[in-house]
Amino acid sequence: MDVNLKEYFESVKGTGVLATADGEGRVDTAIYAKPHIIDKETVAFIMAERLTHHNLQTNNHAAYLFKEDVPGYKGIRLFLTKLREEKDSELLYSIRSKRYAGGKEEGKPRFLVFFKVEKILPLVGAGRDPEKD
């Protein structure tokens, strides 16, 4: 699926869910905002020190599902691999200030987690086996 992620996410509204699993395969899902598009193959999410971030310390794979606010089931799925993260960085707060009012919350670390986009699939269909599609 050939999608310009920057254009896509700027043009649609909807709900995102980020799925992670820990090193033993225990799965978690969490509602997440749209990703920050770094470049054609890289996205980033701002995370608090919670279960999703914890899981990514032992398993660098994640999946992001985005359902558009339209009738039916329209959206995309991103298969992701964690590249790196930054804790309370200037880049994190400059990105965050573009979307959200307010700055750094004292005593609550934030992480800017970068992912390589391995594959993009539609929300429904086309993807029985992510290794073969």
Regions found by a protein language model. Name each.
Residues 1-133:
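Binding-site signature for planar aromatic cofactors or substrates
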